[in-house]
């Protein structure tokens, strides 16, 4: 009975793909195999976490009667452009359930956004929820770039038996080397990354505005010593996580402890 109710609720939330998603998906098909099926969108799914908060997700639903494997994408950058077509519709039309999930404190998800901190536990809670879904057939893969790759390594710390593959793009399981390559603070790269994390889930215009603001103020920020609180010129406010990274250059809070060798534990 509970399974029937879940299926009914999922059907009621399912809508057609937005026009911009259909457009960019068509443009991205060039050179790819023809779509295997049509795709619908189930928006605003609430995934419960152990602390009582919920994380929001959208599911791109392949319109086929066959049981479909699931692709999990966990991101702090929002569930809109470009992830909606690039990972969502484009992969779903080849027979995958694509679950695009906003990480803690981003994109409407509950809790506080503390980069790199809760990804392992939240990923495991997501897998537990997946097991209860009538459309989940027990076959799981993950995909994503940059921070979306880090969320995959966080899951790989203790890979669930359902995990069959990971597609980690331009990412790392330890971001300390990104902040301090060779031991020196990478100011431009770090500030650019912070600008993206602070604004990308707010939509295209706020994101581009934040990047432009950083470009216009970077030279002034680079001349300011100490960098804390000088960097505020770039963002208009203080960023606690950035100050923690600057205050503890030898600490490695950004590592998952999952080295690439962890992939050997993923079920084949």
Which functions belong to the PLM regions below?
Residues 64-68, 72-110:
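Short substrate-entry loop that stabilizes the transition state in hydrolases
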Residues 134-147:
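Alpha/beta-hydrolase fold nucleophile elbow
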Residues 148-160:
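Short glycine-enriched nucleophile-adjacent loop
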Residues 2-16, 157-159, 165-266:
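Accessory cap/linker subdomain of secreted extracellular hydrolases
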